[in-house]
Amino acid sequence: MTPKKEQYARKAEGWTDAEYADARAYLDHRAELIATLGAPLRAGEEVLDLACGDGGLADYLHGSEYLGVDASSEMVAAAQRRGRNVVLGDLNEYAPPQPVAATTCFRAIYYARDRRAFFERVAGYTEKKLVFDLNPRQYGVDDVRADLRAAGFDELVLRPFFSPQRHALPGPAASLLHGLERSGPLARLLLKARFSYLCAAFRGGRN
């Protein structure tokens, strides 16, 4: 086990609470956008969460069936102790037993050994959309869009995601930031300094 994996394993118990200053506000906003961005999800549809950690997102995807996958056995055990439906697997190799409506991958696209091949694999078992985050200061949007198109995802919706991970905000401040996600030029200006996009890739006209 590499030192990084050992550190990850040691933090498995209580991972979500330790990683977010306000886990409820952060994950609730993310779950809302997973359900509504791009092709909307209907009640009862299944969401596959790749590299899910302890599966904390499961508690906020109200109305959806949740399946989490993580490569750390310690994270999987921590998730299962909380009653979350999480199994062991590598995002580069895992395929669910049956197709899912949506797949999400949070802060983990960089774990893909080959990004285009990863998108192609996900497209093979995802019926509606792939939702993931993208740091525009680290990855070229046009390059990612090209890889998605090659995999069959011909539509891409990008939504600025202005929820701080390490800082808890009072309700009015959080609402203001969420409003700025739709502010166009101002949102793009903020993205030059920090934050990321939440992206929904899907097949146009077939969802």
For the regions a protein language model found, what residue spans apply to each?
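Conserved class I S-adenosyl-L-methionine
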Residues: 1-40, 44-53, 180
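Class I SAM-dependent methyltransferase SAM/SAH-binding core
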Residues: 53-93
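A short acidic, Gly/Pro-enriched loop at the edge of an enzyme's catalytic core
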Residues: 94-102
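A short SAM/SAH-binding and catalytic strip from SAM-dependent methyltransferases
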Residues: 102-114
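Conserved beta-strand signature within the Rossmann-like core of class I S-adenosyl-L-methionine
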Residues: 127-136
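Short alpha-helix
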Residues: 138-152, 159
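A C-terminal cap/extension of S-adenosyl-L-methionine-dependent methyltransferases
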Residues: 146, 162-207
